Amino acid sequence: MDNNKKDFKPYIPADKVVPEFTVTALLIGILLAIVFGAANAYLGLLVGMTVSASIPAAVISMGIIRVILRKDSILENNMVQTIGSAGESVAAGAIFTLPALFLWAEEGKIDFPSILTIFLIALFGGILGVCFMVPLRQALIVEEHGILPFPEGTACAEVLLAGEEGGSKAGTVFAGLGIAAVYKFLADGTMLFKSEIGHAFESYKGSQVGIQVLPALAGVGYICGPKISSYMFAGGTLSWFVLMPMIALFGADATIFPASKTVTELLTMEGGGPSALWSNYIKYIGAGAVATGGIISLIKSLPLIVRTFKQAIGSMRSKNGAHKGLRTEQDLSIPVLIVIALVIAVLIWLIPTFPVNLVGALIIVVFGFFFATVSSRMVGLIGSSNNPVSGMTIATLLFATVILKATGTTGITGMVGAISIGGIICIVAAIAGDASQDLKTGFIVGATPKKQQIGEIVGVVASAAAIGFVLYLLNEAWGYGTEKIPAAQATMMKMLVEGIMNGELPWALIFIGVFIAIVVEILHMPVMPFAVGMYLPFSLSAGIMAGGVVRILVEKKKGTEKEKKARTDRGLLFTSGMIAGEGIIGILLAILAVLKIDSKIILPFQLPQIGSLILFIALLALLYKVCMKADKE
């Protein structure tokens, strides 16, 4: 692949027209946008992070179009991954903020947000993300080719260019999906075995060891790798084996706000135990650490953010209109995009169901354009996984809440407005970053930018239409802020807004988390994964760590660099399928729970805890074996 901008030639030449924006690509793309959006919503609310859908979407597309439909068009496959990956980005932006509205509704402070309201927040955020990113394409994707690496976009292009392997690679994804779906259904559907096993230590009160033996967690651990997994595990260890035993030891007979019972009563009451300490205290400490981690990542990125914004705007001003007649240089009309952005801003202000006033609409436009610009370039430099979207959202929330309070929009009205603004900005930044990676893939393979940009909007509309139902399902089935669905970022955003608006928070606990995060930063460790590990139940971090251990074993296996890469990549495809498979069954089980028929599929017997552990070890062994099969291909 030629990295020299002047000598670069796309795989499909500009003067060649091949099938691209087809009915087949649209239908498969929309389906994958909804599937990966729902799966990532479930995953993100569970473990506080999402995974990229571009490569698995591209591989699945190649498997369907090439193997099943007997067609062969790299640009159709690229269109599918463009549409499909938008679902993951919309889900990421929505789940990090909007569950806060459900939490307030559960507290009786507001009505539950309507499906229409959630749809509009997701839709407007997604379309604004595309509108703000398109003018940057020439500057970031074309002019800086060979300078900005765009890791995920380039990797996806390599997968598409190796399309002759599409069938076998798609089989790996589908195998992971099917195995994880059956495993999840047996565990949490039929209750054949427990999906979480654990043990509380009587002699070390407040502590509890445990692990959730689920395929999605192992998949996340494998994809994130051993380092990130170990940081999360370390955060969980600190919370469940240091902080909680300290609370139990020093506060045994004390009633510590926000709990209304003594620590001893929390530990001994029915339904209590270490989990009661987690829900009453550790969630606040973890939220303080997560918020600080987001702010630290934003502060560390500030020089890059300022430089990025200046360079992007400068490039937009200086670029010429050459080659605009070429198929590979055609973008959506910028004047039209500006009009669309302005119309959306007015609609946000005027639509009665939308909880944002004129000041909020202006904040969305200004911060949206700024963070879309920043996100688009930063993913090119450091990849989507390191894009500080949560930090951008926290900064927006802080500014929006202060401004709304200063202009007289206070109380729950101001808090709902701030979360809605933050939700839109979070989706704007996520979609802008995703669109940048997709357009980079398209640039390499020779796609038509205009058609890709329309495809991105199609993916936004499809996933926005579905995300409200997904959020309602998961809340109705298990409830946000619980061990089942912790919703780490959304809970933290809610606390942040409440703290600024009315100050009714256990600030001592939050500041403990703040200073733990600062200590972690001083030790030169990544704060965010450590902080998320602190917040999550230990059993989740342990399950993720198990996947990280498999990744270590795969990478330690002797072989050439090519063999090692093939093993790792095969594992990435299999675990992407595992995550999607569990996510789909998670949504299905939520539907059954809401319909009150989930109990009808429960088996009359259950394996002991050791059975759960053996089955999980077998799943991990299968993952390792799948990775090693790359040597035989």
Model-based region annotation:
Residues 1-633:
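Alpha-helical multipass membrane-protein architecture
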